[in-house]
């Protein structure tokens, strides 16, 4: 799970608990101008064969955390419960997308959109 905070001109995604270990990342700070879109994606698929794990942990259809190469893009995942997933599309960043589980998707989207 990830918590979302907004500073003046950036959004901080802080990875919680053991997911820091599984994802090999504790936080990401993204400038607001690099965020192209943000939307809820409940019940997103976590198929085993749709990506290549670059650095992270994955149990097919159960848990995915870390950096994955998927559909010709580098994507950061941190998802256990697919019901609370949001997707953040980015430009000018290492990651093309962040696919993360949050406590409250509507609230997280509102924070990101400012």
Predicted regions: what they are:
Residues 12-30:
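Short aromatic-glycine motifs in intrinsically disordered, low-complexity regions
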Residues 1-9:
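Polybasic, low-complexity association/targeting segments
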Residues 6, 23-29, 36-114:
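Acidic, Ser/Thr- and proline-rich intrinsically disordered linker/docking segments
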């Amino acid at each position: 799970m990830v918590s979302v905070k907004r500073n003046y001109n950036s959004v901080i995604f802080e990875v919680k608990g053991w997911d820091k270990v599984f994802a090999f990342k504790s936080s990401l700070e993204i400038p607001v101008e690099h965020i192209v879109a943000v939307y809820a994606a409940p019940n997103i698929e976590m198929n085993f064969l749709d990506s290549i794990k670059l650095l992270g942990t994955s149990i097919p259809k159960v848990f995915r955390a870390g950096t994955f190469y998927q559909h010709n893009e580098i994507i950061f995942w941190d998802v256990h419960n697919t019901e609370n997933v949001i997707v953040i599309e980015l430009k000018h960043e290492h990651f093309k997308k962040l696919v993360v589980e949050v406590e409250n998707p509507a609230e997280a989207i509102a924070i990101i959109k400012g």
